[in-house]
A protein has these predicted regions:
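Chalcogenol-based redox active-site neighborhoods
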Residues: 1-154
Length: 154
């Protein structure tokens, strides 16, 4: 699993709106918060993404870009974003390349293999992981105050 202090590789995924999102391009604007979640339309995932939605301004004030990431297809993510009025990109890692590279692939999620473990990474513009949190179980949600604290220290 990718740890704090390690560098990650660039990647490009398709967002819920069909646009290609490249990590390196987002990092040119400042740090990036990668918020991995197991599946759209599930209770804990919905609550987590809505908490990011409701506090997005606080992340923007820290010059950070928030990107939600799951293995759902972009069409499902588009409907999820619409229904929840999400105001940040949701990226489809349908081929499981990014979750595998970062070591947050869950092969035992209520009988499903290959979903994202609920996790959050703060990535600095030089691709270094400044903060990392991975849920011990999928019912846990990240402490967004801790994420913002990590961003404040950059």
């Amino acid at each position: 699993m990718t740890q704090t202090g390690q560098k990650i590789s660039d990647f490009e995924l398709v967002a819920h709106d069909g646009e290609a999102v490249k990590l390196s391009e987002k990092l040119q604007e400042g740090p990036v918060v990668l918020a991995f979640f197991p599946a759209a339309f599930t209770g804990v995932c919905t609550a987590e993404m809505c908490e990011f939605r409701d506090t997005l301004k606080q992340f923007e004030e820290l010059n950070a870009t928030v990107l939600g990431v799951s293995v759902d297809i972009r069409f499902s993510l588009a409907e999820f974003a619409k229904q929840q009025d999400l105001n940040f990109p949701l990226l489809s890692d349908f081929n499981k390349e990014v979750i595998s590279a970062l070591g947050v692939r869950d092969d035992n999620f209520i009988g499903m293999k290959g979903v994202a473990k609920r996790s959050v990474f703060v990535i600095k513009p030089d691709f270094t992981v400044a903060y990392q949190w991975v849920a011990e179980n999928p019912g846990q949600r990240p402490d967004l105050d801790e994420v913002r604290k990590a961003l404040s220290s950059l």
